[in-house]
Curated annotation (Swiss-Prot):
Keywords from the UniProt entry: Amino-acid biosynthesis, Isomerase, Methionine biosynthesis
Record-given protein name: Methylthioribose-1-phosphate isomerase
Function: Catalyzes the interconversion of methylthioribose-1-phosphate (MTR-1-P) into methylthioribulose-1-phosphate (MTRu-1-P).
InterPro entries the record matches: IF-2B-related, IF-M1Pi, IF_2B-like_C, Initiation_fac_2B_a/b/d, M1Pi_N, NagB/RpiA_transferase-like
UniProt xrefs under HAMAP family: Salvage_MtnA
Record NCBIfam families: eIF-2B_rel (TIGR00524), PRK05720.1 (NF004326), salvage_mtnA (TIGR00512)
GO molecular function, one term: S-methyl-5-thioribose-1-phosphate isomerase activity
Family: Belongs to the eIF-2B alpha/beta/delta subunits family. MtnA subfamily.
Length: 358
């Protein structure tokens, strides 16, 4: 399975080449494939904030490379680079407040600096750590894909119709995706007959990104309006909803793309199983429940400005980017560390704190 998945990999969104971070600008997809070259931390933070790069894992990876660029700048300035670098940590942390992987990556980079030995080259050490973060995410994608497809096979042995929402694919990770990784594996194994993708307003990650990724790989995909998804579950024989996560609280509540919560409610009503696929770095045990997850809200212009012209004036806009799906609506959370069915505080604590002999 691993070799087949790697052979099928066609889309990548993050490259570290020649001492610069190259990001596929996801704001322009699918009409234009343009790469942004970031050679300083301000450009990386802007790319994260403005959603040129998006997806929790991808944001964390980009931030790690952003710190490498920041350190290079600080060393060239010749001042107190350790003190100055704190400003860069803060700049990156503030770019997208909901993505748990962002803070995990920044903390891991900070810990690497604290372990620095006197004889080590600080820039080389930090660059190696960023590369390791990138590579570990790719490996996590592979593991999650294999675990997720085993769950789907166990539930029903024949080819199935799956529904996904948002974009939790190669564009949102360092590999070939979390939710879409499971879907890709399922298609290769003959377990997925068709994928339905919700458009995912207002940024249209489903129609612009997920449908584009799946079509590029020849996976049968049907695009649906967000308002049609409950009807879809009722009429099209959907067996699983498979989504990613931006942050998972200690009790199993999941923050994901706005609209995921209502999708989970519909899935529960229609007897459709609900799977969340996310690396363990998305789990924050310091957040007791979903109520503690900071939920980003974006500018009203994303709803009021269409094609450069105002659609309506003098109205207020509520534009949250994420919502929280309660743990009791989730059948299973798939991570690279293992699978948690019917998640709760005890099960997630056991997953994260599990002692390993090897």
């Amino acid at each position: 399975m691993r070799e087949r998945l790697l052979a099928a990999e066609k889309v990548t969104a993050i490259r570290w080449q020649g001492g610069a971070l190259h990001l596929l600008d996801q704001r322009l997809l699918p009409s234009e494939e343009r790469w942004l070259a970031c050679d300083n931390v301000a450009q990386v933070a802007a790319a994260i904030r403005d959603m040129a790069v998006r997806g929790a894992s991808a944001i964390g990876i980009a931030a790690a490379y952003g710190l490498v660029l920041a350190l290079e700048e600080r060393l060239a300035e010749g001042g107190d680079w350790e003190m100055d670098l704190e400003d860069d940590f803060l700049t990156l942390a503030e770019a997208r407040p909901t993505a748990a992987n962002l803070f995990w990556a920044l903390n891991r980079m900070r810990e690497r600096l604290l372990r620095l030995r006197p004889e080590e080259d600080v820039l080389a050490a930090l660059e190696a750590e960023a590369v390791a973060i990138h590579e570990s995410d790719r490996e996590a994608n592979l593991t999650m894909a294999q675990q997720g497809i085993e769950l789907i096979r166990r539930h029903q042995g024949n080819a199935q119709a799956l529904l996904t929402f948002g974009n939790a694919g190669a564009l949102a990770s360092g590999g070939f995706g979390t939710a879409l990784g499971v879907i890709r594996a399922g298609y290769l194994e003959g377990m997925v007959e068709r994928v339905y993708a919700g458009e995912t307003r207002p940024w249209l990650q489903g129609s612009r990104l997920t449908a584009w990724e799946l079509a590029n790989e020849g996976i049968p995909v049907t695009l649906c309006a967000d308002s049609a998804l409950a009807h879809l579950m009722k009429t099209k024989g959907i067996t699983w909803v498979v989504v990613g996560a931006d942050c998972i609280a200690a009790n199993g509540d999941v923050a994901s793309k706005i609209g995921t919560y209502q999708l989970a409610v519909s899935a529960m009503h229609h007897g459709v199983r609900f799977m969340v696929v996310a690396p363990s770095t998305s789990i924050d045990l310091n957040l007791a429940t979903g109520e503690d997850i900071p939920l980003e809200e974006r500018d009203a212009d994303e709803w009021l400005d269409f094609g450069g012209a105002p659609a309506v004036r003098d109205v207020q806009v509520f534009n949250p980017v994420f919502d929280v799906t309660p743990a009791d609506l989730i059948d299973v959370i798939v991570t690279e560390r293992g699978v948690v069915e019917r998640p709760d505080t005890a099960k997630l604590a056991q997953l994260i704190c599990r002692k390993r002999l090897h």
